Amino acid sequence: MEETSLRRRREDEKSTHSTELKTTSLQKEVGLLSGICIIVGTIIGSGIFISPKSVLANTESVGPCLIIWAACGILATLGALCFAELGTMITKSGGEYPYLMEAFGPIPAYLFSWTSLIVMKPSSFAIICLSFSEYVCAAFYSGCKPPAVVVKLLAAAAILFITTVNALSVRLGSYVQNVFTAAKMVIVAIIIISGLVFLAQGNVKNFQNSFEGTQTSVGAISLAFYNGLWAYDGWNQLNYITEELRNPYRNLPMAIVIGIPLVTVCYILMNIAYFTVMTPTELLQSQAVAVTFGDRVLYPASWVVPLFVAFSTIGAANGTCFTAGRLIYVAGREGHMLKVLSYISVKRLTPAPALIFYGIIAIIYIIPGDINSLVNYFSFAAWLFYGMTILGLVVMRFTRKDLERPIKVPLFIPIIVILVSLFLILAPIISEPAWEYLYCVLFILSGLIFYFLFVYYKFGWAQRISRPVTKHLQMLMEVVPPEKDPE
């Protein structure tokens, strides 16, 4: 059998080079520092450098703008603490997927994987790489817009590079993440220190009467939260690689408690720094807030800002790829995707098929280029699944009392997150109804067709098609099923 011969070949190679033989499964290569870097590196992408104006546009004053940024950080921390309980109770990779499976059964878990793998994850990956490409191209096309084909080709190259790095080695992917996280923290520190210097010099005009003209409508507040929480997106990413964390019972909660508050403090201080240099009107008119800040504060070294923003975006893309590949891997292992997507590289011990699949889908999303609106309308779906997952935590407090809980958050924390999730789901639909929200719901529910056709009933003709495809891909990529499932 093919997988047996592949395993035997690997064992022969290992016996020649080393006395230690690792099982063909995901290895625990991610420590506390790498875990913190994954959280910080995935959350801090391009958003805080480019579009803090979105929060200001909906609050219309400085004071509430800063409060929204702080509140979003607190909400992300509360949500992550709930995920810490889930992640130490159910130590499987895949983020929300195994938790929904355990709490509500296979159908909600499948709909989450269907929506995430086809739209949410790869389109976000594509957008981050397009943002990276635009910043790099801007350095070579000064004063004019770079050709769309150049931007798309460079974005595709970035996707190929990141996918290759993560398919080659878990340790290499972690190392790249650590390097880019360090690089983005440099520019964060430069902006914060510059802002504090200006603040100490008495540039506090924009903070006087900071609540004047505040927008108080429910719709505007919900949109401000949406934009703020978009910049915090990634707070749950460490739960996607729980099986690869060393000592997850300690490192998962510690990485969350250190990483997300660190990001929150950085975001608030960066916004304060922006307001020491720009008036609210100037900030709203800026195309890229951090670049405008750099032009005014760092000239003639203002080129540093777009360079480090590019580093920041590529780091966020790497973190997204690193974690999202594990969702595909776990979905394949549960039979909710092609089985070959759950296979492990014999030589590299990485989920190479899942990562390659993810990269291909992301490149497809680059072709149309304008996919921001798609992600905007699916962002409410993200909070639908966040809310369902944390509801599952509450449900399992009563239905699965047998599960060991190394971490147990007070019950009011998941209840708060569930209520906020419900507000974020319903508020934009009620305030500004749009057909796109209905299309999004219909797309999610369309996953039921594929579930019953290919997962529940497992028609023979589908098996006859998938079996030879799996066989040839397995031999081509030298991958085998994991030797054991996590417990």
Curated annotation (Swiss-Prot):
Chain sites annotated for binding L-arginine: I43, I44, G45, S46, G47, D233
InterPro entries xref list: AA/rel_permease1, AminoAcid_Transporter
GO cellular component assignments: apical plasma membrane; brush border membrane; plasma membrane
Entry superkingdom: Eukaryota
Subunit field text: Disulfide-linked heterodimer composed of the catalytic light chain subunit SLC7A9 and the heavy chain subunit SLC3A1. The heterodimer is the minimal functional unit. Assembles in heterotetramers (dimers of heterodimers) and higher order oligomers; the oligomerization is mediated by SLC3A1 likely to prevent degradation and facilitate heteromer trafficking to the plasma membrane. Interacts with CAV1.
One Pfam family it belongs to: AA_permease_2
First-listed, main subcellular location of the protein, grouped into a coarse class: membrane
Free-text function comment from the UniProt entry: Associates with SLC3A1 to form a functional transporter complex that mediates the electrogenic exchange between cationic amino acids and neutral amino acids, with a stoichiometry of 1:1. Has system b(0,+)-like activity with high affinity for extracellular cationic amino acids and L-cystine and lower affinity for intracellular neutral amino acids. Substrate exchange is driven by high concentration of intracellular neutral amino acids and the intracellular reduction of L-cystine to L-cysteine.
Protein name: b(0,+)-type amino acid transporter 1
